[in-house]
UniProtKB/Swiss-Prot annotation:
This is Small ribosomal subunit protein bS18m. GO terms for molecular function: small ribosomal subunit rRNA binding; structural constituent of ribosome. It holds the Pfam family Ribosomal_S18. Transmembrane segments: none annotated.
Amino acid sequence: MSSSRQFLSSALRQCRAAGQRTAQFSTTSPAAAIRDIPTTSFQNAPRTNTNTSSPSSNNNNNAGSSQYKSDMFNLLNSGAGSRGGRDSYNNARDVDGGQRYGSNSQKVQELLQSEVTSNNYMRMMRRRWNNGDVYAPRDLSPYEMKGRNGGWVEAADVVDELGFSPLDNYRNFSLISDYITPFGRIRHSKETGLKPVNQRKIAKMVRRAIGLGIHPSVHKHPEILKNSNGRHLLPLVVPKGQKANKTKNFDGEDEN
C-alpha cells in the first residue's frame, strides 16, 4: 500500500514538473508581442502558483490574475508604454501627418514655380528659321508650337456680311480661289467660317465653275499665277545691254 502511494506521488510530481517546464515557453508570435512596457505597476502582483491546491491559495491566485489583467488594461489605455496608447498614437500620427503634408505642399509649390519659370524662359526663346531648315516638332519651343495645330478662322460669315449671292459669282475667279486649296479642294467650313447654308452655296459655285471649264481644278487660276511672284517663275539670265525685267515660265515662254 505504501509503495503504491509513493508511486502515485512520484508520478504526480513528474506531471507537475513537466507542466511547469512547458508553461515557460510562449506560443505568442514575436511580432504581436508588446515591447518595452514598464513592469513597475504590476511587478508586485501575485502570480499563479500551481504547487498549492488549498482554497485560500486559489482565491489569492484569482485575485492576482485579475489584478494583473487590470494593470495591463490600464497600462495600454493610458499610453504609459514607449509605443503609447491609442490617444498618444493618434496625436503623434496627426502631428507627423501635418508635417508630411506641409513638406509635400511646399515641394509641390517649388516644383510648380520652377516649371512656370522654365516655361516663361522657353516662351521668350525665339529662333529664325530659314528656308530648307530641317527640324522635328520636339525641337520647337512652346512659343513656336503655339498655334501650329489650329488654323486661322474667319470671325464672321462673309456672305452674310457682304450680302452677295455666291451662285451669281461663279465667274469671279478671285472669289473662287479664296475658297479652294492650291490643289482644287474646297476648303472646310472650319477654315472659311461660313454657315452651313452659305458653305453649300460656295461649294456649288466652285463645282459649277470647274464643271464649265472656266476655272482649273488642280492649280490656281492663270491670272493669279501671272500677277504673283511665286516659285513658278524662273529668273531669266539676260545678257548685258538688254532689259532684265523679263521672266519665263516652266514652258520656257516669256511671261511679258
